[in-house]
C-alpha cells in the first residue's frame, strides 16, 4: 500500500514475441513455454524500489493480434511507460516496429517512455535480428533498448526497472504533470512522509503481487 | 422495416390524418429551412409530438434529426431538442404504464429504431463526439450532454452488444465516456454511472478499459462522498457498476486488489449497533456491498486470486468488521443472512481467517463462540430457511481444508471434553441434537455439517467412532455410528416434520463420507450384523421413484463397504460381500441403482457451487462436497464390483509391496531428518561454546590486569611505608598504626591464601576439562559416535559454565581484596599525615620507636613476601590464560571435526539418495511388470492409481487450490 509513486505500463508488440511471458517472469518469476494467446488485455502488478522509493508498477499486457488492435489502443493514453517488444528470431516482428511506434506515438501522451525490447535472447542460434540493428532503431527513434529473455529471466528485471527509472527522472525534471492521472502516474498515499519509516515494513513485499 | 410498415398500415385508427401531415411538414421545415430559428422551432415541435406519436415521428423524422446533429452543432438548443426527440423515440422508459401487449410492441419499437439508428456506425460516433467535453464550462454543454447521455444509455439498453462493439472500435470511445464520472454536474455524473452500467454489461474488454481509466478510484470516491451505505441511489448505482466491472473478470479483480481498493471497502461495514437507520435504500446498498465482497472471494474464482483477496480482507480488518455485524443486534434478517454468506466465503479454505473466525465470540454473558451461536440457529426450526442455509454454508466454509477446525469440532463430542465443558452447550452437542431431532431439515443440516468435519480427514473419521450417546435411562450407551444406522433402518417409525427422504439422505451422505477412505469405520459399520441385510434389502426392493435416490445411496454405502474393506471381518470380507450382491441384488441391478444418484435432477445443480442455495426446503437434498465424493467413487466401485477375486488378490499384493517400499522410503526420510536435526544441534552447541570461551578469555585478561594493578599498589604502599620509616623513625605513638596494619595485612594474606587455593582448584578443573576435550576429540574422530558427541559437548559446556562461574566468584573476591587494599592505603596515608602533627605535640619515646622500627622492618619483610606471592599468582594467571587459549584452539579443532562429520553425514545422505533412486528403479520395474500384465489382458488401472498415489498427493493439493497455490500466486 505504501508506495511513493504508481506507474502504469503497457506492453505492446506482435503476437508471439513474448509479451505475456515477460510480464509473468517479472511478476511471478515463472516461464510459460506454451503460447497462451492473450485475449484483449491482462493485468499484472509488482512493487519495485528506485532511489530508495517504493514504486508500484501496474502493467497491462496487450494482445498482439491485429484483431484486438482497436481495444488495445484504448490503453495508450493512460500509460506512463510502454515496453515495445519484438522477437529477435523473427525479422517480421522487427519490421513491424515502425507501425507500432506510429500507433503508440499517435495515441499516447507525448511524454510516455518507450523501452524497445528484443526478446528471446536465449535463442542465439536462431537469431534473425542483430543486436546492433535493435540499438540503431532505438537510437534513431529516441527509445531505450535492451535484449531480454523471458525464458532465462535475463534482463527482464532491468527492462521494467530501467523504464521506471527513466519515468522517475522525468518526474524529477518536472516533465510529467504528476497531478494528472491521465499520464499514468499517481503519487502514493504517503508521498512526502519520511520514506525510511515505511520502507522497513515494506521490505518483504517487493516481489509478486503482495497486496497492501 | 417490414414490421414498421405493418404497424403503420394497421393503425388507421391511430393518429389523425392531420397529425401525420403536421409531422411531415415539420420534417420538411427541418430539412429545407435556411433559418436556424425556423429549424429550431420545427425540431422543438417534433419533440413535443414524439412521445404521443412515437412511431410516426420516428419513421419520418429520424434521418432529419440525425442530419441536425451533424450540421447544427454550433447551436446547443437545437441539438438538445434533436437528442431529446431521438431519446423519446428510442427509449421505452416512459411507457411503463402501458398494458402488456402494448408494452411488448413498444419494446420492439425501441429496438427497431435503435437498429435503424446504429445501422450507420457514424451515428454512434457522432453521438460520442457530442458527449466529449469540448464546451466544458458553458451551459451549451449541459443542453447537449445530458440528453446525449440518456440517448446513448437507451441505445445500449436496446441493443447492448452491437452498440458496445461500435463504441469499442471507435478511437478512445470508452475512455471518453469515462470522463462523465468527472463531470461537476451531479445529474450528468449520475446518469453517466447508468450509462457505464449499460456499457459494461457482460463485456470483458470494455470492463477492463473502464477499470484502466481509474473507474475504481472514481466510484469509490463517489461512494465515500455520498456517505457509504447511508448514501442514496447513486451509491446503489455505483455499486452495481462496480459489480459489473469485477464479476467474473479476473484481470479487473487482480487490479482491484493490487490497487489496495479492498482496504477502502472496510468503512462500508462500520454500520454501528444503533438500530436507528435501516432505510430500504441502506439495506439495498449494504446488500450490494456484501455481494461485491463475495465477488472478490467467490469459490469459483481462480484459487490463488481468492486466497490473496481473503488475506487482504483479514489484514485490513474487513473480516473483523463483518464479524461485528454478524454479532450485532437489530440487523435486518436479510442483511444478516447475506453477511453470514459473505463471512463464509471470506474464510473458506483460508487458515488465518478460519482461525480468526473460530476466536470470535458473541457478546453474550458468558461469551459464547460465534460458531456455537450460529449452529443454534441452524438447528432451530423457527429461524428463516435462508438463514439456516447460510449458517450451514458458514460452517462448511469454516471447516473447508481446515484440519484444525475439524479436530476442534469433533473433540467437543469426545467423552473427555464433554465432561470438561460443564454446562455450556458445545458445537458437537448442537450437531447431535440436530441429527436426532424431529425436524428433518435439522437432521439434514446437522448430518451434512458433521460430514464436513470429516472431509478428507482420516483422523477425525476414526475419532468420531469413539463417540457414545446416552440413550434412555437404564439402557447402555450407543455409538454415534450405531445410532445413525438405527435411525436409518427405523426411520419410518419416528414422526417427523418435513420430508422423510431428507433425513435419510442426510444420514446416508454422512455415513458414506465417514466410511470412505476409512477401513476401521467400515469394520465398525459391518460389525453390526443388521446393517448389511438392511442395505441389501433396500437396494433389492422394487420401490417407487421417490425411493430411488435412497436406494442409490444405499448402494453407494455398500460399495464403499466393499471398496474400503480391509478384510478384517471374517463374515464380511470383500469377496463375501460381492457374492452377496450377486446373489441378492445382481451386479447389473446394483450398478444401475448406484447410478440413480448422479442421475438425480438436483445432483448437477448441487455439484456446481459449494453454497447450499435452495429455493425451498424440499430442494435441500444434495451437498456439494458429497457430489464430489460420488464422482470420485462411482467409477471405482463399479470396477470393484466387476473385478474377480484373483485380480483383487493381485492388487492386494501389489499394494503391499508398494506399502513396503513406502515404509522403507519413509524410514530413510525420517533418518535423514533426524540426522539433520542432530547436526543442527551440534552446530549450535559449538557456536555457543565458542562464544563462552571468548567471554572467559576476556575475563582472564581483565583479572590479569587487575593483579598488575594490585602489584603496583603494593609497590606504592611499600615505598610510602619506607618513606614513613625515614621521616618518623622515632615515632612514639605508632601503636595505633601498628595495631591496625599487621592485622590488615594478616587478613590480606589469608585471603590471598584462599585465592591461591581456589586457583589451584581452578587449575585442576582446567586440567579435567582438558582431558575431557581430549576424550571428546578422540570420540569425534569416530563418526559413528555422533549421537554421543552431543552429550560430550554438553558436558564440556557444563564444565565451561562452572569454570566461568568460578572465575566470576574469583573476580568478585579480587574486587573485595582490592577495596580492602584501598582502605589499607588510605589508612596508611591518614597515618602518615597524622604522625607529624602528633610529633610536634609530644615527646618521642625511644623505646617505642625501636619497637616500631622492628615492626616496620617485619612489615616490610612481609610485604616483600606478599609481593612475591602476588607475582607467583600473576604467573599462575598467565598460565591459566595460556591453558584457556589452548583449550580454545582445541575447540576450534573440535569444530573442524564436526565439519568433517557434517560432510560425512552429507555423504551418507547421498548414499541414501542413491538408495532412493534404486527404490525408484524398483518401482519402475513394478510398473513395467504391471504393464506386461496389462498387455496380457489384465485390467490393472486401479493398481496404477494406487502406485502413483503417493507421488500424486502433492500435485493433487495444488489442483485443489490448497496452500501451495496460495503461495504460488503471491
Ligand atoms: N525461448 C524463448 N521463448 C520465449 C521467450 N519468451 C516467450 N517465449 C515463447 O514464445 C511464445 C509466445 O509467448 P507469449 O508471451 O505468449 O507471446 P505474446 O507476445 O504474449 O503473444 P500475444 O498474447 O498473442 O500477443 C510462447 O511459446 C513462449 O514460450 C523467450 O525469452 N525465450
Ligand atoms: Mg500475450
UniProtKB/Swiss-Prot annotation, chain A:
A lipid is attached at residues 211-212 (S-geranylgeranyl cysteine). One of its GO terms (cellular component) is Golgi membrane. Brain and parietal cells. Prenylated. Prenylation is required for association with cellular membranes. Regulated by guanine nucleotide exchange factors (GEFs) which promote the exchange of bound GDP for free GTP, GTPase activating proteins (GAPs) which increase the GTP hydrolysis activity, and GDP dissociation inhibitors (GDIs) which inhibit the dissociation of the nucleotide from the GTPase. It is an enzyme of class 3 (hydrolase). It is found in: Endoplasmic reticulum-Golgi intermediate compartment membrane; Melanosome; Endoplasmic reticulum membrane; Golgi apparatus membrane. The small GTPases Rab are key regulators of intracellular membrane trafficking, from the formation of transport vesicles to their fusion with membranes. Rabs cycle between active GTP-bound and inactive GDP-bound states. In their active state, drive transport of vesicular carriers from donor organelles to acceptor organelles to regulate the membrane traffic that maintains organelle identity and morphology. Belongs to the small GTPase superfamily. Rab family. This is Ras-related protein Rab-2A. It comes from Oryctolagus cuniculus (Rabbit). The lineage of its organism: Eukaryota, Metazoa, Chordata, Craniata, Vertebrata.
